[in-house]
Amino acid sequence: LRSRYYYGKTWHEGWINAVNPFRATIVLGTPGSGKSYTVVNSFIRQQIEKGFAMYLYDFKFDDLSSIAYNHLLNHLDAYETRPKFCIINFDDPRRSNRCNPIAPEFMTDISDAYESAYTIMLNLNKTWIQKQGDFFVDSPIILLAAIIWYLKIYEGGKYCTFPHAIELLCKRYEDIFTILTSYPELENYLSPFMDAWKGGAQDQLQGQIASAKIPLSRMISPQLYWVMTGNDFTLDINNPEDPKILCVGNNPDRQNIYSAVLGLYNSHITRLINK
């Protein structure tokens, strides 16, 4: 980055170098101070020129995405394998690719389903972060994890998407538990719910289920459902055989909902790129 500074009663011209771009770089500044223009935009351009894969969070879509797209068109020769340019944009699905953040092929154990449930529920309920371990915090996470894992093992994961999980959760709990507990690997996982059901503690059970339903109901949206049920690309963005430049768009007016969903994508991307 070009720099100009005053020292010794003289103006000097120089460069600011990110010596190790693979380590974290923090850019601090007040709104409107020029963080994107002076630093972030240069990062985007230079990383594309060096042939890197990229995960770009565009808070005000499509400010940064347009820069990345146009610069990529002019520097495709920097890549050994031509990268895919992918977009996740919930505001305008016509300008978005589709991607399933809980794709069954990337889940090998029920703990993977739990991590997905944990991420989305805590992103939707920020106050739960300080209450981890509480009964009415852990219960909805476990229930959602069980539903995700059921969708993973049912018919080879054909319906394993987050919208399907939300829709199944909204059905009658008598039907949900009858289906889930018919699978041995979920029977013990859901034993606290079954004990409450068989013990006649209906109020407690409905409270547990409502703790999962109410926050997730905020995500019921045709746009979110459409984007999250497709498989246009996978989240292993730094795969040498299939590199990607992924731009995810947010909207300041809807950030409470979109940020929770994007947090799910983020957790899976982080896990996959570090393998």
Region spans (language model):
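P-loop NTPase motor domains
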Residues: 9, 16-275
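Charged, amphipathic alpha-helical linker segments immediately N-terminal to NTP-binding catalytic cores
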Residues: 1-5
